[in-house]
């Protein structure tokens, strides 16, 4: 079938993570590949009760079309929570409900990018964002990062030489894939540059409340110059991803563009889903659920780190995240993580090769590990299997 496709389709590929997940469907495979929340944290019974209440008391509205911006009580609840927990000063009129924060990424590309424009991003960065933006045919310029976040001097150098930089995409808290969190100094430095060069910052914040230890750091959206920040949030990592509920917050002029794009894309996010979540937040709040997520993921992270320390051969380094769902491993440069993955799959264990997280390629000796999904017993066994493969590869 010879259908003539749009030029942008040449840049789109299946998500590498999704392709790997297909290989891990066998129950015996211990997968550190996906970014899946632990299903045992989903409050299914409570949601069932809330759903019954919503449908019995307000069924016609829950099953009807609703405003593009979102269900007003949910927008208010999100604004209140952002202001109380994150130190922002947003109004509910600045909250747009999206079908997961992934939709916010797609809308950002649609609004801000013409072919050939430049996206500035961390190196490495979230694979889902790379794929979302690629549809709009940009160039990616990767900014150097270290344990404290984006290197401000490198960002300044790039901004000074790139006239068509359209936005800076960042994940400052428990970054996917590295697990690192930006220091306050780095956050302020990036905001200073955003104001000076008048370039928007897209702050993707799925994990900020999943902190195991250490002090929380204010989001960019709470700092001076926050009118330049588009904040993307989601309930997928702290509630449940199947409802596909996220949000964004932006300054009024840009916010209205997101509303127009949302209208064209899907009119609005599921009314029933929004009312389910609003009812849950009103009845139970979110703190209890988040604490359960934190306690579970902390224990799983600890087992992964402890087993890696005991079993991995010399010459391998990794990050030690204070929260979130991922850590990042750097192998000796002589090793290729894709080749190691093939060997690990024979041992029924999987991860994501790190090269997928660099939009311009390279860095094939890196990989991402997820600790949120598997039990502590399976994490320990899976890391031991990986260690066996790595020892053989290094020898």
Question: Could you tell me what each predicted segment is?
Answer:
Residues 1, 346, 359-395:
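PLP-dependent enzyme catalytic core of the Aspartate aminotransferase-like
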Residues 29, 206, 210, 345-368:
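Conserved PLP cofactor-binding pocket of PLP-dependent enzymes
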Residues 225-295:
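Conserved core segment of the aminotransferase class I/II
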Residues 8-100, 107, 282-283, 350, ...:
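N-terminal small-domain helix-loop-helix segment of the aminotransferase-like
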Residues 335-340, 377-381:
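Short, conserved charged micro-motifs
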Residues 61-198, 202, 208-226, 297, ...:
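Conserved core of the PLP fold type I
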Residues 278, 291, 295-305, 317-330, ...:
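Conserved glycine-rich beta-strand-loop-beta hairpin in the small C-terminal domain of fold type I
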């Amino acid at each position: 079938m010879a259908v003539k496709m749009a030029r942008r389709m040449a840049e789109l590929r299946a998500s590498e993570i999704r392709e790997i997940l297909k290989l891990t469907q066998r129950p015996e495979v211990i997968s550190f590949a996906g970014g899946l929340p632990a299903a045992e944290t989903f409050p299914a019974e409570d949601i069932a009760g809330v759903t019954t209440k919503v449908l019995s008391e307000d069924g016609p509205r829950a099953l009807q079309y609703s405003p593009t911006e979102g269900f007003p009580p949910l927008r208010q609840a999100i604004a209140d929570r952002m202001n109380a927990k994150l130190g922002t000063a947003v109004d509910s009129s600045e909250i747009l409900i999206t079908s997961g924060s992934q939709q916010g990424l797609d809308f950002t590309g649609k609004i801000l990018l013409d072919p050939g424009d430049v996206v500035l991003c961390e190196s490495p960065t979230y694979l889902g964002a790379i794929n979302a933006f690629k549809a709009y045919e940009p160039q990616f310029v990767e900014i150097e990062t270290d344990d404290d976040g984006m290197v401000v001097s490198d960002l300044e150098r790039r901004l000074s030489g790139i006239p068509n930089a359209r936005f800076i995409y960042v994940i400052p808290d428990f970054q996917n894939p590295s697990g690192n969190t930006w220091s306050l100094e780095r956050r302020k430095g990036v905001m200073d540059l955003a104001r000076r060069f008048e370039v928007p910052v897209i702050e993707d914040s799925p994990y900020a409340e999943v902190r195991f230890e250490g002090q929380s750091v204010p989001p960019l959206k709470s700092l001076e110059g926050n009118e330049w920040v588009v904040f993307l949030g989601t309930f997928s990592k702290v509630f449940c991803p199947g409802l596909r509920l996220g949000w964004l917050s932006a300054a009024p002029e840009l916010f209205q563009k997101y509303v127009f794009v949302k209208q064209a894309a899907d009119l609005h996010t599921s009314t029933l889903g929004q009312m389910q979540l609003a009812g849950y937040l009103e009845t139970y709040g979110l703190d209890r659920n988040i604490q359960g997520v934190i306690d579970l993921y902390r224990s799983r992270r600890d087992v992964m780190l402890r087993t890696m320390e005991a079993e991995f051969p010399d010459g391998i380094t990794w990050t030690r995240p204070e929260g979130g769902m991922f850590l990042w491993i750097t192998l000796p440069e002589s090793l290729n993580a894709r080749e190691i993955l093939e060997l690990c799959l024979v041992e029924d264990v999987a991860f994501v090769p790190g090269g997928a997280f660099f939009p311009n390629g390279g860095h094939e000796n890196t990989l991402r590990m997820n600790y949120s999904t598997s039990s502590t017993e399976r994490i320990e066994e899976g890391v031991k299997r990986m260690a066996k493969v790595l020892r053989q590869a290094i020898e």
